[in-house]
Every structure is written in C-alpha cells, then in structure tokens.
Amino acid sequence: MSSQNSFMASKKEDKGKNIQVVVRCRPFNQLERKASSHSVLECDSQRKEVYVRTGEVNDKLGKKTYTFDMVFGPAAKQIEVYRSVVCPILDEVIMGYNCTIFAYGQTGTGKTFTMEGERSSDEEFTWEQDPLAGIIPRTLHQIFEKLSENGTEFSVKVSLLEIYNEELFDLLSPSPDVGERLQMFDDPRNKRGVIIKGLEEISVHNKDEVYHILERGAARRKTASTLMNAYSSRSHSVFSVTIHMKETTVDGEELVKIGKLNLVDLAGSENIGRSGAVDKRAREAGNINQSLLTLGRVITALVERTPHIPYRESKLTRILQDSLGGRTKTSIIATVSPASINLEETVSTLDYANRAKSIMNKPEVNQKLTKKALIKEYTEEIERLKRELAAAREKNGVYLSSENYEQLQGKVLSQEEMITEYTEKITAMEEELKSISELFADNKKELEECTTILQCKEKELEETQNHLQESKEQLAQESFVVSAFETTEKKLHGTANKLLSTVRETTRDVSGLHEKLDRKKAVDQHNFQVHENFAEQMDRRFSVIQRTVDDYSVKQQGMLDFYTNSIDDLLGASSSRLSATASAVAKSFASVQETVTKQVSHSVEEILKQETLSSQAKGDLQQLMAAHRTGLEEALRSDLLPVVTAVLDLNSHLSHCLQNFLIVADKIDSHKEDMNSFFTEHSRSLHKLRLDSSSALSSIQSEYESLKEDIATAQSMHSEGVNNLISSLQNQLNLLGMETQQQFSGFLSKGGKLQKSVGSLQQDLDLVSSEAIECISSHHKKLAEQSQDVAVEIRQLAGSNMSTLEESSKQCEKLTSSINTISQESQQWCESAGQKIDSVLEEQVCYLHSSKKHLQNLHKGVEDSCGSSVVEITDRVNAQRQAEEKALTSLVEQVRDDQEMVGEQRLELQEQVQSGLNKVHSYLKEELRNDVPTGTTPQRRDYAYPSLLVKTKPRDVLLEQFRQQQQEYLESISSVISEAVEPPVEQDSLEDEPPVAVNDSVISERSCIDLSMTCQEKGGIRFFQQKKALRKEKENRGNTTLLERSKIMDEVDQALTKSKLPLRMQN
C-alpha cells in the first residue's frame, strides 16, 4: 500500500519543475551614502522585473531588464519575504518533499540577515513576532505550530554544518573542539545524496530549544570584519531540518512520512582589493570565491545541458547536488545592492540568478516507511550502538586508526554493492531458468501433438504430391511462357524508354520554342507600351508647340499694329504742326506788308497836304519819298522774299518727310503680312507633322495588333501540334518544326517591317523638325533685318527732320535780321530827310516831328509784329522737334524690346523642337527593345527512335521450344542430383555446426506452401534469403529448366527431412 501511494505521488511529479528564483534588494548603507553613490537598480514587484541602469545617470537607453519569480525592493519587510517564499515550501516539506532554500549574492547584501535575521533590542518581542527575525527562526516556529495544530505525531531533528576553506565542521558538536573536520561520502541509497560522517543531528521538542541551538551555532560560525562588511560571514552554513511525521492509512496501517528542509546561508563573493582582505582573510576570500565560481559553473552546465556537471569540484556543490537538477524543490534568494559602486557584482549576481531559472528539478515525495520497518531500523541501530558501547567499555573489540577504519568501511561498502549486484544477477538467472524450463515443457507437449498431426498429414502429403507434380509441370510450362512474355516486355520497355527519351528531347525543344515566343511577346508588349507613351508625349509636345506659335503670332500681330499706329500718329501730328507753322508765317508776312502799306500811304497823304507849302520842298520830299519807297521795296524784295522762299521750301521738305513716313508704314505692313504668312505656314506644317506621326503610330499599332493575333494563332497551333506529337511522334515533329520555323520567319519579317516603318517615321520627324527649325531661323533673321532697316530709316528721317527744323530756325533768324536792317535803314533815311526838311522848311518841323514819331511807331509795330511771329514760329518748331524725338525714341525702344522678345521666342521654340527630337531619338534608340539572341533556341534536327515493336511467339511454338530444352538438359540432371544430395550426418556434429544453408543455385520457383514447409524443415533460413535466391534464379533462367529444378528441390527436401536435428535447432 505504501509503495502504491509513493508511486502515485511520484507520478504526479514526473514532469520537471524550474527552480524558483527570488531577488531581494537591500537599502543603502552608511558606507555607500558616504561614497555619494547613486541608485542603479529599480524593482517592480507587480511585474516581477528588475531594471539595472548600466550607463550614465541620464542615459535612458543603457538599461537591462531581468524577470524573476518574485522581486522585493528595499522597502520589503522580513515577514513579506517569509510569507511569499517560505510558506508554500514549508507546506511541501510537511507533504514529504525535500526542499532547499539558499541565499546567494555579494558580501554585505543581506544574505545572513534574510536567513537568520537579528534580535531586536526590545526583549518583549519573541522570535516569531520580532520584525527583524529571519527565515530560519520563523520556519521552525511555524513547523511546530502547524504540526501541533494538526495533532500529528512528529519528531524534528536539526543539524548545522559549516563549510570553511573547503573543510566541513559541525557547529552543533558537543565537544568543545570545533576544529574537528568531518568527512563526506556518497549515499548508496541515493545516487545524488551524500552522507556526512560524524554530523550531529539533535532532536528538538519545542521552539525554544531551536532558538538556543541557533544562537549556539551562530556563536561558533566564523565571521570577520572587512572594509565592505563589519560582520562578514567567512564560511557557508547549511541548516538542515528533518521531520518525521506519523500518518494512518484507510486500512489502519501506520506510516512514517519524512520531509527535509535545507536552509543554506552562503558566504558572499567579494573583491579582495575593495574589501582590504590580507593574509588569512585573503585566503578565506579566495576559497569562498572558488566555491561560488564552481557553483556558477554547475548552474551554467545545468542550463546548457552539458554531459558533465562539475559537482565534485567543490564541497558546496557536492552537498547541493540533489538541490540543483535533482529530486528536491529548490528556491534561490539572490540578494543585491542598489549602489552604483557595486554595479559589477550586482549584474553578475543577476546573471547567475537569471541562468538558474532554467534549471529543471524533478521533485519526488520521499518514500513512506511503515511502522514496522522504522522500528526494525531503530532496533538495529540501537543494537549496533549497544555493541559499540559495550566494546568501548570492555575494550575487547577491534580498535583501528581512523584512516584504516575509513578504508575498511569503503571496502565493506564496495563489497556490499558487489554482493547486491551478484544477488540480483542470480535472482534474474533463476527466473530465466525457470521460464526456460516452463518453455521446454510446453515445447515438448507441442512436439508430441505435432508428431501425431504429422502422421496424419503424411498421408495427405502423398496424395498431394501427385497433384503437385502435375501442377509443377503445368507451372513450369506457364513459367516458360511467362518468361518469354517477360523478355518481350523488357524489349518493349527498352523501346518505350527510347521513345520517352525522344519525347523528352522534343519537349525540351518545344520548351525552348515557347521561351522564344515568350521573349518575343515580352519585347512586343514592351514596344507597344513604349509606343503608346511616345505617341501621347509627342501629341502633348506638338500641341504645346502649336499653342506657343499661335500665341507668338498674336503677339507679333499686336506689335506690328502698335508700330503702324505709332507712325500714323507721329505723321499726323507733324503734318498738323507744319501746317500751323506755315499759316502763322504767311499771316505774319501779310500783316507786316499791310502795316507798312498803310503807313506809307498815310505818309504820302500827309506830305501831299504840305505840298502847297513849298513846291520845291514838295518836289524834294516827293523825291525822297519815292527814293525811300523804292529803297524800302528793294529792301523788302531783297531781304523778305528769300525768307519766305525758305519757309516755303521748308514746308515742301516736311511734306516729303511725311511721304517717307508713309513709305515706312507700308514696309511695316508688308513685314506684318510676311510674319502672318510665316506663322500660318508654320502652324500648318506642325499640324501636318502631328497628323503624319499619328497616322504612322496608328499603323504601327495596327501592325502590332496583327502581330499579336499571329502569335496567339501560332501558340494555339503549337499546342495542337504538341497534342498531335504524343500520338504520331516523328512525322508530326517534323511538320511542327517546319510550321514553327515558317511562323518565326513571318514574325521576323513583320518585325523588320515594323522596324522599317519606325525608321521612316523617325526620318520624317527629323526632316520636318529640321525644316521647321530652318524656317523659323530664316524668318527670325529676316524679321531682325527688316526691323533693323525700319529702325535705320526712322533714324534717318528723324535726322532729316532735325536738319529741317534747324534750317527753319536759321531762316527765321535771317528774317529777323533783315527786318532789323530795314528798320535801321529806314531810321537813317528818316533822319537824313528830317535834316533836309529842317533846313528847307522850319515851319514844317512840327509836321516832321509828327512824321518821325509816326514812322517810329511804324518801325516799332513792324518790329513787334515780326518778333512775335518769329518767337511763335520758333516755339512751334521746337515743340514739333521734341514731340517727334520723343515719339521716335519710344518707337526705337519698343523695336528693341520686341527684337529681344522675338529672340527669346526663337530660343524657346528651338528648345521645344530639340527636346522633341531628343525624345524621338531616345524612343528609337533606347526605349524600343530588340529581341537579343540567347543561343538557347533549339535548332532543327532529326530525331532517332525505334519504329519496330517486338512481338512474342505463339503459345504452341513456345511450348515446343520448352520441350526441346527439356530433352537437351536431361543428361545434366543426374549429376546435379548427386551433388545436391549428401549422406546423413551424426547428431553431435549437427549440434556443433551452424544451421544448414541451401545453395542458391538449387532453389527453384515453388509455391507458397513449399516455401513455408522448407523454412520449417531447415530451421534457420530466412524468408528474404529465399526471395533473393529466387531473384537470382529468374536472372539465370536460361541455364536450367524449371521442371528439372523442381525435381532437384524435391530431392533436397527429401534429404533434409531425413536429418535428425536436435530440439534446440528446431526451436
């Protein structure tokens, strides 16, 4: 019953379980605060993650994240750690499991504090209520509490082991000498367990005894002060608690359940340089680091599943062997420091703990002992101890040294193991002998039954052999016929293989042709796409050019209209101003002549009045007046007539200038008409070019569509040819090759035509574009020359007008000087006449004075009228000259601006035409793709294949050949029989020899019944060997006939049935 319970419990735990890893971070201590160290560790208890900042303080990217089963931050209390980690494990210990909890980490990170804790200064706290108490006191308190509440009978034993400098010491030893070293042996009952010889296990009955034991062990444990920890543990300690619990089954059987809990407080790893350890302390630190390094290598080997795990390299790892990868439930508490000065050790501890998570243990419940077995074990132990005690008291026993005693104990253990092994082998062999004896008896009974059956079957066999002989003859005949058919089938198979190879070759050639068609199709599709894109681009470009030319035509028309209007306005203004100037001059001349005539007549009248005064004076006066009149007329004729003539000449010259301006306007109109005709013709040529390119591209597209339809037709015809190829082989192959070749030649010719049409389109586009460029350039040059000529003529006319105006000014000045001269001469004549009249007639002095005044007034009026006329004429001529200069200057500037604009338009048209040409060249040279020969298209060839099929001879002819072969080989039958049949041998020799093997050349084709019977009689020939022999016989069928081989097989069977094989051979 106990074995059943243990089996069921262990079956539930067959599946491995990972080691539980817990991380606890302590707060900052005084040393770290003095060093101004910052925190590099963040603990997230909810997400069970630890974040380590490996970079600078502000570096957010330099973080490493670790995930564990539980995470406790600096603020975590002792009771929280105990309830989360130890309470579930304690329940499993009470269930009968072996469990281990050990603390791992750097020195000074709180391992001993976590495992043992401290006593508060306030004595009112008990161990279980003390907030600073560790795992060990709380565990023991809860063990007694739980077992007492359940009313279970139990016993608790504790032991405290110290590992110092790779030596074992018992901290609970009753002897005052703590330096006694303990020895460790492998446990023969548990392959992964160890036995510590001389380790004291103390039975405790209540929690108070446990506390005294803890205090005694803590006092004996080796500690020392270093620079990093004032109370640094210099050794590893293993506190073991073994619980024996009594339970009663349903049947009333009393069982003892055993649970064991190992609480391990490891010494911390330390940096000797930082801890200040020297001499003895340095050796201690080296041994501690060595054992912890071995523990790390064991963890790494378990994680990586290496074949060798170095448990024996350290006493610590050897003790923890069952806890790491064994049948124990294990939990690791990794203690770390949050300070930046301990970053390297913290990262190392977290890496070890992270690797330890992957270790798989297979926990098993300890086997429960019955009360009788436990009492027996205790009784034997008591008797052994009594004997040892009596021998020690009486001193009549054997006393040995410890080394000899250990050697003797080792030999005894090894001999016990060998005895156990041999005992197990003897038991197994006895069981095997028993089974063999039973099998022998069964076989003997079966043999007797088989003998009886055999006698009955022999009679049936004799009857069956007669039928079998007849069947064999028929089978031999059928086999011969079948062999003939097989030969024919092989020949037909060879012929079919040749035909299939021919079909494979043709299929490869057809695949090459398909690839050629696909390449052609891909090239044509690419060219068609490029062709459509090119047509759209050319359409857009020519539309842009046409719109640009139309805009430029409109601009040129407006420019020429502006030139015409400007020149017309200038001519009208000049004509009106010249007419006004001529009328003003004529009016001035008429007013002067009228004034002079009036004054002269008035003077004559006045002089005639005085004629009576003195005839002589009258005569003299008349002479003087006549002389003065004649002189005045001559002066007017000689001085004023040339001026009037010059003004008239100036008027005619201005009208000639107007005619020249009209001629220039006519030239500008003709130039305008030339420009209109040029742009109209250029638009027509561009439109024609567009229509030609569209028609050419449409023809190319239609040719491409037809070519595409031809390719589709060729593909359909090709597939039909391939289908016909399978049925009619070579003839259809030749026909298909010829048709495919013709279609390819047709495709090539069409492709050549398409290429020629594209080439002609390219030439037409080049020709039309070059003509358009030349036409534009010639018209541009012509327009520039004509504009230059117009500008030169306008400048010449402006120069001639300027000279005319200057001449007019000179004539006006000359007229003014002539009038001044006449007035001076008149004044001189009047003075002389006055002197003569004064001398002649004093009485006419008053009259002369009045005449003098009158003449002076006349002179002054003539001067005023002439001066105002001259000023008016001069102002009008200057205004006319300035207006004409301004108009001509603006016209010249406008002509220059228009010339620059025409140059820009010419450059823009040239760029557009050049870009169109570049697009055409790139389309014809780069975008159009040619079918590049790959060299993989199959060539035309002839295919060799068999044309005749083998036919099997008729059945009658085959049977006649079979009978002839039987007659030919009858002589060789007797020799074969004599070699095959051997004399009987002795039974002893048969027992020594291996099983008989039949010669492969003797075995013939037999029925399934014969094969099974032969295998039974021979007793060692495997079925596949006979199949192999039969295969060989089929290959060498031409050497011996089937009938003779069947007879030989019968002889061999008879010889084999007569042999007396032992029973072992038959079985």
From Swiss-Prot:
<dbReference type="GO" id="GO:0005737">
    <property type="term" value="C:cytoplasm"/>
</dbReference>
<dbReference type="GO" id="GO:0005876">
    <property type="term" value="C:spindle microtubule"/>
</dbReference>
<dbReference type="InterPro" id="IPR047241">
    <property type="entry name" value="KIF11-like_kin_motor_dom"/>
</dbReference>
<keyword id="KW-0547">Nucleotide-binding</keyword>
<dbReference type="GO" id="GO:0090307">
    <property type="term" value="P:mitotic spindle assembly"/>
</dbReference>
<keyword id="KW-0175">Coiled coil</keyword>
<feature type="modified residue" description="Phosphoserine; by NEK6">
    <location>
        <position position="1046"/>
    </location>
</feature>
<dbReference type="GO" id="GO:0051301">
    <property type="term" value="P:cell division"/>
</dbReference>
<dbReference type="GO" id="GO:0072686">
    <property type="term" value="C:mitotic spindle"/>
</dbReference>
<protein>
    <recommendedName>
        <fullName>Kinesin-like protein KIF11-B</fullName>
    </recommendedName>
</protein>
<dbReference type="InterPro" id="IPR047149">
    <property type="entry name" value="KIF11-like"/>
</dbReference>
<dbReference type="GO" id="GO:0019901">
    <property type="term" value="F:protein kinase binding"/>
</dbReference>
<dbReference type="InterPro" id="IPR025901">
    <property type="entry name" value="Kinesin-assoc_MT-bd_dom"/>
</dbReference>
<comment type="subunit">
    <text>Heterotetramer of two heavy and two light chains. Interacts with aurka.</text>
</comment>
<keyword id="KW-0963">Cytoplasm</keyword>
<dbReference type="GO" id="GO:0005524">
    <property type="term" value="F:ATP binding"/>
</dbReference>
<dbReference type="GO" id="GO:0000922">
    <property type="term" value="C:spindle pole"/>
</dbReference>
<dbReference type="InterPro" id="IPR001752">
    <property type="entry name" value="Kinesin_motor_dom"/>
</dbReference>
<dbReference type="GO" id="GO:0007018">
    <property type="term" value="P:microtubule-based movement"/>
</dbReference>
<dbReference type="GO" id="GO:0003777">
    <property type="term" value="F:microtubule motor activity"/>
</dbReference>
<dbReference type="Pfam" id="PF13931">
    <property type="entry name" value="Microtub_bind"/>
</dbReference>
<feature type="domain" description="Kinesin motor">
    <location>
        <begin position="18"/>
        <end position="359"/>
    </location>
</feature>
<feature type="modified residue" description="Phosphothreonine; by CDK1">
    <location>
        <position position="937"/>
    </location>
</feature>
<keyword id="KW-0597">Phosphoprotein</keyword>
<dbReference type="GO" id="GO:0008574">
    <property type="term" value="F:plus-end-directed microtubule motor activity"/>
</dbReference>
<dbReference type="InterPro" id="IPR027417">
    <property type="entry name" value="P-loop_NTPase"/>
</dbReference>
<keyword id="KW-0132">Cell division</keyword>
<feature type="binding site">
    <location>
        <begin position="105"/>
        <end position="112"/>
    </location>
    <ligand>
        <name>ATP</name>
    </ligand>
</feature>
<dbReference type="InterPro" id="IPR019821">
    <property type="entry name" value="Kinesin_motor_CS"/>
</dbReference>
<dbReference type="GO" id="GO:0051231">
    <property type="term" value="P:spindle elongation"/>
</dbReference>
<dbReference type="GO" id="GO:0008017">
    <property type="term" value="F:microtubule binding"/>
</dbReference>
<keyword id="KW-0498">Mitosis</keyword>
<dbReference type="InterPro" id="IPR036961">
    <property type="entry name" value="Kinesin_motor_dom_sf"/>
</dbReference>
<keyword id="KW-0131">Cell cycle</keyword>
<keyword id="KW-0067">ATP-binding</keyword>
<keyword id="KW-0505">Motor protein</keyword>
<feature type="coiled-coil region">
    <location>
        <begin position="365"/>
        <end position="480"/>
    </location>
</feature>
<dbReference type="GO" id="GO:0005813">
    <property type="term" value="C:centrosome"/>
</dbReference>
<dbReference type="Pfam" id="PF00225">
    <property type="entry name" value="Kinesin"/>
</dbReference>
<dbReference type="GO" id="GO:0005634">
    <property type="term" value="C:nucleus"/>
</dbReference>
<keyword id="KW-0493">Microtubule</keyword>
<keyword id="KW-0206">Cytoskeleton</keyword>
